[in-house]
């Protein structure tokens, strides 16, 4: 099943806030919020996520501040995937209005409120709606993620080269 555009967008925003918060004053808010989200899938999964968060935060804390952005780029795709999987697992028939989606939005907003401006650069907010809308974002230092809406009809090109 193809991932819904809202899942990719929300997971990317949440993951950006999470890795941006690591090794910062906003870390505890981010960690506690994400662990609470995964607790919905059971205590074992929440414990595994908590352990991974602690490992990632420790790695970032031990990394030279000049090299932290590179490590964050490496951590970002895994957290985006984990959050996307969680959102898809709990989307049910309500989709973007699920309790998990609402809670992730709340956690992300709380973390953003605590992050300094340089740390907020890790959070990318992309929203596109309407027929033919395209949302594109760069993650992990060069990975481009595209979400396409329903294509709008386009007039035929009059250029012989097809442009």
Task: Show where each model-derived region lies.
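Short amphipathic alpha-helical segments that predominantly mediate membrane engagement
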Residues: 1-8, 31-131, 146-163
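Pore-lining and gate-forming transmembrane alpha-helices of multi-pass membrane transport proteins
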Residues: 8-16
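Residues at secondary-structure transition points
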Residues: 22, 138, 143, 147-148, ...
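Short hydrophobic alpha-helical membrane-entry/anchor segments
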Residues: 16-29
């Amino acid at each position: 099943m193809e991932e819904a555009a809202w899942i990719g967008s929300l997971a990317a925003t949440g993951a950006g806030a999470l890795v941006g918060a690591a090794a910062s004053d906003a870390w505890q808010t981010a960690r506690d919020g994400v662990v609470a989200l995964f607790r919905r899938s059971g205590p074992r999964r929440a414990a595994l996520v908590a352990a991974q968060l602690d490992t990632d935060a420790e790695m970032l804390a031990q990394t030279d501040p000049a090299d932290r952005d590179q490590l964050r780029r490496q951590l970002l795709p895994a957290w985006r995937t984990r959050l996307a999987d969680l959102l898809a697992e709990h989307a049910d028939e309500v989709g973007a209005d699920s309790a998990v989606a609402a809670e992730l939005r709340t956690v992300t907003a709380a973390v953003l409120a605590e992050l300094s401006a340089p740390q907020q650069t890790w959070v990318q907010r992309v929203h596109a709606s309407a027929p033919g809308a395209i949302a594109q974002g760069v993650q992990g230092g060069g990975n481009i993620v595209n979400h396409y809406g329903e294509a709008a009809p386009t007039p035929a090109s009059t250029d012989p080269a097809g442009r």
